[in-house]
């Protein structure tokens, strides 16, 4: 069996996770002169805001309830770039805007289709992560002085041995208004963003065999 090709890389800053947080962190790091790597396990940037999920950025405007407000900083730059070339709000074009923003930074190395699966620590600090890049079939050993976990799931922290918790904390711990009275193991499920078009007439639909059928009572 032929083994994977192996490549060792060295950076000042290594950011794992190419969603909006990771992308903005990588751009900021590169602009400050640090040799930066952005490790993203998908073929596109943006995370939930990419064409793969299509959750548009609406934090500052509260989903357009406050249209006079706007995102700031690098996110604002990206949204202005998108407005300039993407009047149709096509999410595939938005993907290209984010990709170009990363490629514009000479200090930033973009590693797409690259999945981290191990981390090495020394004296309580991460020194190296091990990744597999699907598109090149390479095993990458990425060394860095600073690592940032922008995975959205704390994956880097987990591989580094950091303490973690899952589920919902009780209301008494942090006094969050919607927290349950007792702690539980419930977590957010899969996020499905549907897109519907009014065809103007009934359209037949046959649900697949694996679909779960919900009653009106369950939906109430």
Segments and roles (model prediction):
Residues 2, 28, 34-35, 40-125, ...:
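Conserved N-terminal/central alpha/beta ligand/cofactor-binding core
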Residues 158-220:
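Rossmann-like dinucleotide-binding core of oxidoreductases
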Residues 7-19:
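Beta1/beta-strand and adjacent pyrophosphate-binding region of the FAD-binding site
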Residues 18, 133, 151, 160:
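Glycine-rich, N-terminal phosphate-binding loop of Rossmann-like dinucleotide-binding domains
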Residues 16, 142-152:
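Short hydrophobic core segments
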């Amino acid at each position: 069996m032929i083994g994977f090709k192996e490549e060792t890389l060295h950076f000042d800053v290594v950011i794992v996770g190419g969603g909006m947080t990771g992308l903005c962190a990588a751009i900021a790091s590169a602009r400050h002169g640090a040799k930066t790597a952005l490790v993203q396990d998908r073929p596109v940037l943006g995370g939930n805001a990419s064409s793969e999920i299509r959750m548009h950025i609406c934090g500052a405007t509260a989903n357009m309830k406050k249209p006079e407000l706007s995102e700031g900083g690098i996110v604002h730059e990206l949204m202005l770039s998108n407005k300039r070339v993407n009047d149709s709000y096509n999410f595939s074009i938005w993907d290209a805007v984010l990709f170009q923003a990363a490629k514009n930074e000479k200090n930033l190395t973009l590693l797409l289709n690259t999945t981290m699966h191990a981390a090495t620590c020394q004296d309580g600090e991460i020194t190296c992560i091990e990744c597999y890049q699907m598109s090149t079939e390479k095993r990458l050993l990425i060394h860095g002085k600073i690592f940032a976990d922008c995975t959205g799931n704390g994956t880097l922290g987990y591989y580094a041995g950091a303490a973690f918790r899952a589920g919902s904390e009780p209301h008494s711990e942090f006094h969050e208004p919607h927290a349950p009275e007792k702690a539980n193991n419930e977590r957010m499920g899969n996020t499905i963003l549907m897109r519907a078009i009014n065809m103007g007439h009934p359209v037949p639909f046959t649900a697949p065999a694996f679909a779960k059928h919900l009653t009106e009572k369950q939906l109430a």
